Amino acid sequence: MSNTKWTLRLIVDWLIIATTITLSSYYPVLVIPGLFIIGSRLQALSIIGHMACHNFCSTNKTINKYLQYLAFYPLGVSPTRYKKFHFAHHRWLGDPQKDPEVLLQLEVKDRWSKHRKSDLLLDLCGIHYDEILQIFKYIGTKYSVLFTVCMQALLV
């Protein structure tokens, strides 16, 4: 994909998030659907950040770096720490002692094995706040303003 397509996708995702937040503030009936929309766009941004981390979004490393920051910012994720975490995952892929993603899964295994139907909606909305914080422990986040505001709004 060309530099422009990745940048355009990032801009569109940011605009969808901003529009959804704005419309939800004026029309409360849109809050629940808005959670799904914002969740899907945050997931899309994380994919853009991941691809930029591998320098796949552009042949220019500086553009990839900026795309990482713009993609990871609403997630509260530091691109530098994400790269460290993610590249360790690639280096130790599947190793139960060294792969950070495997270690994370083992840490929350009890919670997943006792998964209830009522948690499905929370998973779809991304509202498992304590698990999100656990993941952030591994990737060393800097809480962004957008992330903090969204999480506080969800917890109220």
Where are these regions (language model features)?
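Acidic (Asp/Glu-rich) catalytic motifs at the cytosolic membrane interface
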Residues: L42-K61, Y82-G94
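Conserved donor-binding loop and adjoining core beta-sheet/short helix segment
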Residues: Y27-L45, G49, N64, Q68
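Post-HEXXH active-site segment of zinc metalloproteases
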Residues: S58-Y73, V102-L103
